[in-house]
């Protein structure tokens, strides 16, 4: 492959309350993209920010010599929905996603482009020497291992959004109409050739992570329920095992009553309650999983848009400027 296969590179950055990081982010992303032999555009998706992020994005995108495009959503839809809005706007032959918190260095962008030019459909990344808390790293490891088992898609770092996708992968993802999706797994399901590169990782310089405990739990549910029906099959297996154990315990309790007498049965009340609570807990867990799937089906059936673009801000073309005059 040569440079003519990738004529335009689109860099998509979802932004949510990143006012403090944006000036440095724009400077570093622009500097990295200027090193590319291809032309480029940088698309900033404002995901319903409440600070000054919207104004910074609009002002930067309106500059006459800017290659920035500002996509302003009417409210917060979440990281992956915002990225899908960027995919819809992007015109590039290669599309790169990047978080706005600067934990993944924009200087890695040329490496991703170079890897894509070698014929890879998706270029993933793995964070080297992660600068996150012990809790975040432990949760990520558990999620990565669980997702590899559940989806069958082997990726080393599901949480790193610094990735590159060829145009046909973007078009395939845009054809998918489900409301909840996880972009890295979805992209890999369409890719023929993939590769993962190790990239640097820095501490968050400004603000707090948007992924708290509840957000990580919601992400786990999103990952599992939007990409695989494995939990439903596991639920059937667990239900069968629990039913078998319950039947075995019932026989055992009857035998113990016959052998040990009624006094022993009275002493076993707490054991019975413990067993009962265990079975009820498994049932409630199963009902919760079924509820997740049914809720997602209901959301998909309503067929509401994933997002609503309030405004797109970009530099006016000469023809547009003449029309305005």
From Swiss-Prot:
Gene3D superfamilies: Spore Coat Polysaccharide Biosynthesis Protein SpsA, Chain A (3.90.550.10)
Superkingdom of origin: Bacteria
Pathways per UniProt: Glycolipid biosynthesis; 4-amino-4-deoxy-alpha-L-arabinose undecaprenyl phosphate biosynthesis; 4-amino-4-deoxy-alpha-L-arabinose undecaprenyl phosphate from UDP-4-deoxy-4-formamido-beta-L-arabinose and undecaprenyl phosphate: step 1/2; Bacterial outer membrane biogenesis; lipopolysaccharide biosynthesis
Signal sequence extent: none
Subcellular location: Cell inner membrane
GO terms, molecular function: phosphotransferase activity, for other substituted phosphate groups; undecaprenyl-phosphate 4-deoxy-4-formamido-L-arabinose transferase activity
Gene Ontology CC terms, in alphabetical order: plasma membrane
Pfam families reported in the protein's UniProt record: Glycos_transf_2
EC code: 2.4.2.53
Chief localization: membrane
Spans through the membrane: 234-254, 269-289
BP GO annotations: 4-amino-4-deoxy-alpha-L-arabinopyranosyl undecaprenyl phosphate biosynthetic process; lipid A biosynthetic process; lipopolysaccharide biosynthetic process; response to antibiotic
UniProt membrane topology term: Multi-pass membrane protein
Sorted UniProt keywords: Antibiotic resistance, Cell inner membrane, Cell membrane, Glycosyltransferase, Lipid A biosynthesis, Lipid biosynthesis, Lipid metabolism, Lipopolysaccharide biosynthesis, Membrane, Transferase, Transmembrane, Transmembrane helix
HAMAP family noted in UniProt: ArnC_transfer (MF_01164)
Family that this chain belongs to: Belongs to the glycosyltransferase 2 family.
Function recorded in the entry: Catalyzes the transfer of 4-deoxy-4-formamido-L-arabinose from UDP to undecaprenyl phosphate. The modified arabinose is attached to lipid A and is required for resistance to polymyxin and cationic antimicrobial peptides.
Protein name: Undecaprenyl-phosphate 4-deoxy-4-formamido-L-arabinose transferase
The encoding gene: arnC
